[in-house]
Amino acid sequence: TMGATQALDIVSRALLQPGDPVMVEEPGWAVEYARLAAMGMRVLPVPRGPEGPDMAVMQRYCETMAPKLYVSVSVLHNPTGYTLSAASAHEVLQMAQRYGFYVVEDDTYCHIAPDHAPRVTVLDRLQRSIYVSGFAKVLVPNWRLGYLAAPPELVERLLDTKLLSTLSTPTPMEQALALCMEQGQLRRHAERLRQHLAQARTRSVALAQAAGCRFVAEP
């Protein structure tokens, strides 16, 4: 896809109709919520805490609004930096199974996130979940390349929507990315970037704590 943003747009266009309720995280990425609202969706904010979403609020929406999707940045949440706990991930998936909505996992920061962080789609094995990610955060911002993975029964609808939208993604960019992956350059670059960010995070936390700041959750 043309970045993770287009992947999210494809999911919305393929699976939703104007007026459909969609659960989103509060706070969260304002661009995604504005896009959903512009498409005529009913945006349902779910408070996001250090461990995950407010399950009581989700339960209430499920019982009264019958949401179609729950859009979540589960790892390195924007803007809080929270990472979904394994227990919360299981709770979300159980609710998705019970009420029939899909969890859209926006894993934009996957290349710089901790390896041990739980992913909803890994736990779920793409039954009630859709995985979205991209490469702009780790390679070049102007390389708008992304991808999505979805349950088999949704793939054809998503592919048709992609073809009707942009037909294809620029081939030279795809080939350059494929070469980076085949030669191991992407993996090595991501490892160096994670090390650099870990050092910067440690210094930043120490400076903030020395200045009297405290954190609700570990950055």
Predicted segments — roles?
Residues 1-99, 111-126, 197:
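Conserved core of the PLP fold type I
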Residues 67, 215-216:
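Short, surface-exposed, low-complexity cationic segments
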Residues 95-100, 207-211:
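A structural motif corresponding to the C-terminal end of an alpha-helix
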Residues 101, 129, 213:
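Short, conserved active-site loop motifs that form the nucleotide-linked donor/cofactor pocket
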Residues 130-209, 216-218:
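PLP-dependent aminotransferase class I/II
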